Amino acid sequence: MKIIYFSFTGNVRRFIKRTELENTLEITAENCMEPVHEPFIIVTGTIGFGEVPEPVQSFLEVNHQYIRGVAASGNRNWGLNFAKAGRTISEEYNVPLLMKFELHGKNKDVIEFKNKVGNFNENHGREKVQSY
C-alpha cells in the first residue's frame, strides 16, 4: 500500500522517514493535483483550528477514489482540535482513521503505524479495518 503524506512543518516527514517504509510519496504544492492510480493511506498534519491543509484537500479532490485510510499528526495543546484533520478526512471519505500522533510521534507511534499498515495490507479487501 502506498503511503502518501503532507508535512507543513517537517513533523510528518520525520515520522514517515522513521517508519523506513519504501512506497511513499510526499505531497507538495507542485504535485498536489497529479493523479495517483493505486490505493493509498494518507498521513497529514493539522493546521489552524483543526483544518485539513490545502495541498491535501487538492490532492484528495483528484485522488479520493483510491484513499483507504488516514493517520494524522497534531499538537495536544489544541485540545479537541488535536489531529482533527484525520477525523475530518475519515468522515468525509468514509475511511478508517488509523491513528493520531503528536508532532513527529514517539517510537511507539512509529511501531503502531507500521503494524497498522501491515495489518491493513493483510486485511485489505477481506474485511473492514477498525477505525481509531
Curated annotation (Swiss-Prot):
One of its GO terms (molecular function) is FMN binding. It comes from the Bacteria. Pfam families: Flavodoxin_NdrI (PF07972). GO terms for biological process: protein modification process. Probably involved in ribonucleotide reductase function. PANTHER family: PROTEIN NRDI. This is Protein NrdI. It comes from Staphylococcus aureus (strain NCTC 8325 / PS 47). The lineage of its organism: Bacteria, Bacillati, Bacillota, Bacilli, Bacillales. The gene is nrdI.
